[in-house]
């Protein structure tokens, strides 16, 4: 769970000397990873609902100049439906659908937000989806996949020619992971691949996409949530002052966080490619 405050267990990450891609060896993958995603429940995510909406509203501002006036959108890894809920309020004339492996999260999206959501992975649902989406988005998904190229090719297959694909993922070549090393908060067991801008571009080109723009991905977080993250990774002597800060700061205050270690990519489908 990416909202977890536990960082004690760190994966073994190796770097390919040929392609420069960093990844966790398959032998070190969490056992039954697909079942884990299907069964995951994360009430903490619901507690940070306001900040997630603010984050997705910011993402919409970043991608909006590239979207047509009307169309259909697919979100892969739609989780509890917060992005799609923000999207439908801004783009009421669009059709949209989400795909989410977590049974708990997809049911929340359907029952609480009335978001059209299919349970399962993209591969599970690909035969039931359209093949002409104007836009596909996938926020914080690519690092979780054991076959990122295969995933991108499947994304390509459900999109219109010249369709727009927007996603966020990690940039391990950024200054922050270099500075923090093993204490970098996004170094966690459920993240299998760690990208750099050039390795991400190589994958996208192989999958038939061209990058139109790369930007910093902006997270909005409450002071309380940020302090909790910091307590988990900083020296113990800082725990007391951080807890004091949590206790005296109004919970409604949210701040933008953008160190550049997570990038937002806006891409265009240039050509179809063969299925994997």
Predicted regions and their residues:
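A short glycine-rich, Lys/Arg-flanked "PGG" loop and its adjoining helix->strand segment in the class I
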Residues: 149-164
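Conserved catalytic loop of SAM-dependent methyltransferase domains
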Residues: 212-237
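A SAM-dependent methyltransferase catalytic signature shared across enzymes that methylate proteins
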Residues: 198-215
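Short N-terminal helix/helix-N-cap motif within the alpha/beta-hydrolase-1
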Residues: 146-150, 177
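Short, glycine-/aromatic-enriched active-site segment of Class I SAM-dependent methyltransferases
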Residues: 167-193, 198-203, 229
């Amino acid at each position: 769970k990416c909202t977890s405050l536990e960082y004690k267990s760190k994966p073994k990450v190796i770097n390919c000397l040929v392609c420069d891609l960093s990844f966790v060896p398959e032998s070190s993958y969490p056992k039954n990873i697909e079942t884990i995603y299907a069964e995951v429940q994360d009430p903490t995510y619901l507690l940070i609902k306001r900040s997630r909406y603010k984050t997705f509203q910011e993402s919409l501002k970043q991608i909006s100049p590239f979207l047509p006036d009307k169309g259909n959108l697919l979100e892969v890894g739609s989780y509890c439906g917060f992005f799609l809920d923000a999207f439908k309020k801004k783009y009421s004339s669009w059709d949209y659908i989400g795909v989410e492996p977590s049974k708990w999260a997809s049911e929340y999206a359907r029952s609480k937000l009335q978001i059209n959501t299919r349970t399962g992975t993209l591969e599970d649902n690909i035969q039931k989806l359209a093949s002409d989406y104007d836009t596909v988005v996938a926020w914080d998904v690519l690092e979780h996949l054991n076959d990122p190229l295969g995933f991108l090719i499947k994304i390509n297959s459900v999109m219109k020619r010249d369709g727009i694909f927007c996603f966020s993922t990690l940039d391990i070549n950024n200054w922050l992971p270099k500075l923090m090393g093993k204490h970098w908060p996004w170094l966690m067991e459920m993240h299998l691949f760690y990208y750099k801008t050039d390795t991400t571009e190589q994958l996208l080109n192989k999958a038939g996409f061209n990058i139109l723009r790369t930007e910093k991905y902006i997270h909005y977080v409450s002071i309380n949530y940020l302090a909790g993250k910091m307590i988990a990774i900083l020296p113990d002597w800082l725990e007391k002052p951080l807890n004091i800060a949590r206790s005296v700061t109004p919970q409604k205050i949210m701040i933008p966080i953008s160190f550049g270690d997570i990038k937002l990519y806006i891409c265009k489908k240039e050509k179809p490619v063969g299925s994997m």
